[in-house]
């Protein structure tokens, strides 16, 4: 799957250059997929939040700015998964910063995601369509 966002690429690259590391990963805090219950110790429902903003975690939004030395972390072969060993080793070596994106971001991993994004486009609510502004 892929993600769709209204990331300011110029600001992302500027951020990357200012930190002088091998890679900058864009992060986002996606909305939760389900309603959340706040429950007391005796199981009484105290509050209900419809699809709250995630759990506060920042996730990999899938947009990267890389320096050539990133290739030194990628092994040979077709079985390399970039988000696993290469990124973990870059993080261990202190070579990753994150650009925290506070704007629109949505994955397109499922048919449900695709349909929602298509509907946003049809309704002219596609926040990633920045070239018409």
Positions of predicted regions on the chain:
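Catalytic-core segments of class I nucleotidyltransferases/pyrophosphorylases
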Residues: 4, 10-17, 30-31, 44-133
């Amino acid at each position: 799957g892929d993600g769709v966002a209204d990331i300011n690429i110029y600001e992302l690259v500027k951020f990357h250059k200012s930190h002088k590391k091998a890679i900058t990963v864009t992060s986002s805090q996606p909305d939760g997929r389900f309603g959340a219950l706040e429950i007391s110790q005796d199981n009484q429902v105290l509050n209900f939040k419809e699809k709250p903003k995630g759990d506060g975690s920042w996730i990999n939004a899938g947009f990267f700015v890389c320096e050539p030395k990133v290739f030194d972390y990628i092994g040979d072969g077709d079985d390399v998964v970039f988000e696993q060993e290469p990124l973990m080793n870059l993080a261990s070596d202190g070579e990753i910063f994150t650009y925290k994106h506070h704007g629109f971001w949505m994955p397109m991993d499922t048919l449900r995601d695709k349909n929602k994004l298509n509907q946003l486009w049809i309704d002219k609510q596609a926040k990633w369509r920045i070239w018409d502004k």
